[in-house]
Amino acid sequence: RETFNDKILKKKFIFEYCTTSKINVFRGFHFQTKNKQSKFVNVLKGKILDIVIDLRKKSRTFGKVFKIILSKKNALGLHIPAGFAHGYYSFEKENIIYYKLDNYYNPKYESGIIFNDRTLKIKWPSKNMIVSSKDQNLITINQFKKKIKYL
């Protein structure tokens, strides 16, 4: 574990947790404006479409979306650098997602990008996604550019 963190990711993860999601649930796209978090995500049970948006200052890929399927079956993990918004869609009846983070969650600095922002051009696997009211009221990428500018 220490070798992976120190040599490959060059990160000190200080916090770990699991979360669960049911089928057709989307959570995201979340980030913190201060106390930014680098994350490592993998799936202990089920299958998710994991999606990140680059919000880093002066990044050549600012505003670009990256998607990957993570599942118990494929045993892949995803390192998400600080400065990215993160979200995922759950494909199966029961999904358990495992996180490692290099900074603690602070609700004072939480924000996010709304899932259905057309400028992101995301093709969703379902038209019947379940999205929390909190996540339905996040800002667009254009509002982010005006209000927050970058991470």
Describe the predicted segments one by one.
Residues 1-76, 94, 99-151:
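Non-catalytic, conserved peripheral segments adjacent to functional cores
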Residues 70-79, 84-89:
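Beta-rich strand-turn-strand
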